[in-house]
């Protein structure tokens, strides 16, 4: 049973985190293990679990800060990795996209960009050049693209920020379809 007093809850979380970190270190980052994302592009390994735990901790720390009216930006490096981790872990799937095939680009102000392609074969995420970084290269046609800081993109991906708070180019209705999609895998 979870403790109810604040100090006891903080101590329980710290001890639980140390148990998880100890088990992950003992296993090693490449050691295979159970994950809740068997059909994604993320590795089913202790390293994958550790990477995901960083994102969960960052987002839930934001939640706690927002609950007391003092939300802080996510740490930049964690947020940059967080966009990619979310797309590879949560979005990537072999479940068919039930709509017309399309792509979504996610552009972080810090200079990284990712593309999520969705079609009858599912969803796949890749890194793509940031807009304006490749001379003479025309951007690929995408259904919609979302622009913001990496932290804003992570919070958008985890449904902490509505689409209207970020710049969305293209068909904004596609963003609604993506956010509502619940793949079977």
Where do the language-model regions lie?
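Acidic/His-leaning functional-site neighborhoods
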Residues: 106, 112-145, 149
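A glycine-rich beta-turn/hairpin centered on an aromatic-Pro dipeptide
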Residues: 83-116
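C-terminal interaction segments
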Residues: 137-185
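Short, contiguous alpha-helical
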Residues: 35-95, 153
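Short, solvent-exposed segments of well-ordered alpha helices
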Residues: 4-7, 44-51, 144
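Short amphipathic alpha-helical/adjacent loop interface patches that line ligand
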Residues: 17, 57, 150
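Short, helix-capping/interhelical loops that line the mouth of catalytic, cofactor-
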Residues: 1-35, 71-81
